[in-house]
Amino acid sequence: MSAARPSAHETTGTGTASADLLLLLRERQPLVQCITNAVVTGFTANVLLALGAAPAMTDVPTEAGPFARIASGLLVNLGTPHAEQREAAVEAAHAAREAGTPWVLDPVAVGALPVRTRLAHELVALSPTVVRGNASEVIALATGGAGGRGVDATDEVEAALDAATLLARTFGTVVAISGPVDHITDGHRVVRVHTGDALLTKVTGGGCALGAVMAAFASLDPDPLRAAVAATSVYTIAAEIAAEGASGPGSFAVGLLDALDAVTPELVAQRERLA
């Protein structure tokens, strides 16, 4: 059993936004609707639960829209976009926009496959709060070009920064580019997050679950850049902690859930590395 978590009404003494938002998340336990891919549904739900949020995997048309209006945050992940889920994603995104629910678009493999590419362009036009993807996905979404090998990036993170800036300014969104060093921009400011571990790339859902964490944090702060940075810092610091005790991808996946449960605002403040 993990130690009791501090209340958000207690001062952390850290003065860091990421630490303070972690406290707030654990007090509010935001309800995060996840329209995500079939491969990562269980892992994503467990990540949110371990962190202190409440997952809801509501992805059925006629239910997805109404739920997005009452959820704290919404994730739309295009990893396995079957027909019913595509309908639910568009319905939920429209509802979130109308209700002011912050939402995250993860355009998995955009540019590599036609169905998800059309859907990604339709959804980004609805101005998601955050777009999260690898460098190749961000470039493809911004330029209409090819997007690497499915979910794998073939471009460097720095090479995608111009595309991310264009996306952010065009659609009024924050763009988070995942990589060895995550780059996050609102089109004017750029923050680089220097925490994480390569084992995240060896676990199915390691990146997709971060989109759900971003949706949780986006519900807590009116500045989506600050929220995306906090989500990335907390998640990647937990990954570092998990990697320290892991013997490989299997133990890392379990350890990541334990680390997300155990990570404290004080640890976040100590280990966060931003530039």
Swiss-Prot record:
Gene3D superfamilies named in the record: 3.40.1190.20
EC number: 2.7.1.50
Needed co-factor(s): Mg(2+)
Recorded superkingdom: Bacteria
Gene Ontology BP term (one): thiamine biosynthetic process
GO-annotated molecular function: ATP binding; hydroxyethylthiazole kinase activity; magnesium ion binding
Residues reported to bind ATP: 132, 178
Keywords: ATP-binding, Kinase, Magnesium, Metal-binding, Nucleotide-binding, Thiamine biosynthesis, Transferase
Amino-acid positions noted as binding substrate in the UniProt annotation, renumbered to this chain: 57, 205
Record has Nucleotide-binding as a keyword: yes
Pathway of action: Cofactor biosynthesis; thiamine diphosphate biosynthesis; 4-methyl-5-(2-phosphoethyl)-thiazole from 5-(2-hydroxyethyl)-4-methylthiazole: step 1/1
Enzyme class: transferase
Listed NCBIfam families: PRK09355.1, thiM
Function statement: Catalyzes the phosphorylation of the hydroxyl group of 4-methyl-5-beta-hydroxyethylthiazole (THZ).
Name by which UniProt lists this protein: Hydroxyethylthiazole kinase
Organism, scientific name: Clavibacter michiganensis subsp. michiganensis (strain NCPPB 382)
